[in-house]
């Protein structure tokens, strides 16, 4: 429903701008980077009681379903396509990254939010908005200090 009927999809043309990361703007435009689309999906799915977890792959954020013998991954940036563990490992290898098992595990809420903020730091820096960049960097530091896994 989110990707089909509602039309949410990856923001390929505006990947490096804050509007593809800020959830209010992603909801309005229905375009976002992987982590933003995953956050919207996670919020809706959890509200419905679905057992989904954030998965912080390097270069591509996904949603994981860790029920049963093998996890299943949802690639929100690719229209909600389901991926197997092997497919996700291949995606990592195709991007010159190690297929490390740790990459395939859920991440904490703090880690997810810190990653969102790091993206915004980079995006605001690229636009020359040092004030906003510094603001989101303070959020990163606060989140990293209080991560429940730290």
Indicate residue ranges for each PLM-predicted region:
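A structural boundary/capping signal
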Residues: 1-150
């Amino acid at each position: 429903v989110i990707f089909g009927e509602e039309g949410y999809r990856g923001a390929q043309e505006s990947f490096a701008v804050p509007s593809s990361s800020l959830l209010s703007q992603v909801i309005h435009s229905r375009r976002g980077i992987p982590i933003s689309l995953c956050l919207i999906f996670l919020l809706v799915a959890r509200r419905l009681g679905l057992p989904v977890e954030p998965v912080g792959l390097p270069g591509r954020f996904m949603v994981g379903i860790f029920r049963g013998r093998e996890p299943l991954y949802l690639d929100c940036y690719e229209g909600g396509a389901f991926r197997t563990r092997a497919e996700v490992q291949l995606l990592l290898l195709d991007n010159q990254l190690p297929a490390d098992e740790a990459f395939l595990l859920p991440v904490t809420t703090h880690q997810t939010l810190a990653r969102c903020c790091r993206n915004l730091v980079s995006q605001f820096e690229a636009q020359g908005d040092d004030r906003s960049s510094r603001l989101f960097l303070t959020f990163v530091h606060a989140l990293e200090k209080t991560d429940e896994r730290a």
